[in-house]
Amino acid sequence: MDSLLEVERLSKTYIRGTETIHALKQVSFTLEEGGFIAIMGTSGSGKSTLLNILGALDAPTSGTLTLKEKRQRDIFTEPAATLYRQQHIGFIFQSFHLLDDLTVQENIALPLMLKGMDDKTINQEVEIWLKRVGLTKWNNHRPQELSGGQQQRVAIARALISRPPIILADEPTGNLDFKTSAEIMQLLQELNREQQTSILLVTHDATVAAHAKRVLYFHDGQIVADQPSTGDVAPILETYEQFVGAV
């Protein structure tokens, strides 16, 4: 597969009073086109910091990002950061981040509205994605009228409607029960396979990580192991315990 995003020697340091915190230490890896990477690690290991940097929500202290063989030099300041996100990144969060005052279809339409697309095109795309995530009958409902799994499906449709090459998912099943979590992960797998959308997903759950094609293990701001996923949970748990600690 061709390289989509190359992360090279990425570091992030915070200064808090007299304390220096090294959130990321020389992190390097490649996300291929159509790739699906799960990132596992303990709280505070740098997983979410990495996603924030890849989404241009935070800037690295050092290191480089190369997207489609083009080094991204200016994406950490506005307005370049917003443009980068609009063109290349879709976000899925643990807490859904839907707007309560908008209907399901209005929430899904937001990225296209922000791009200034015409109403006809927006309505056509929203209809496609409502059907794809199984929420056509819920199009005029508001988020608070939906279950957690349904709300996450809305968030997934919103993230994908502008067809970004990369999805960044931060604990997307963290607020869901086991059955709903499995359904959401199956949906992400299908979208990764059918749309060839590359996914980088942070999780603490080995069952969730097993849906990815590859697992990176973080500890103390560093990648300590990199393992292809076979879909089995046991090897992931074994590697986690070996390199990170007991689950």
Model-derived features: where do they sit?
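ABC family nucleotide-binding domain
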Residues: L4-L5, L10-I223
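Conserved beta-strand-loop-alpha-helix hinge in the C-terminal portion
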Residues: Q222-A246
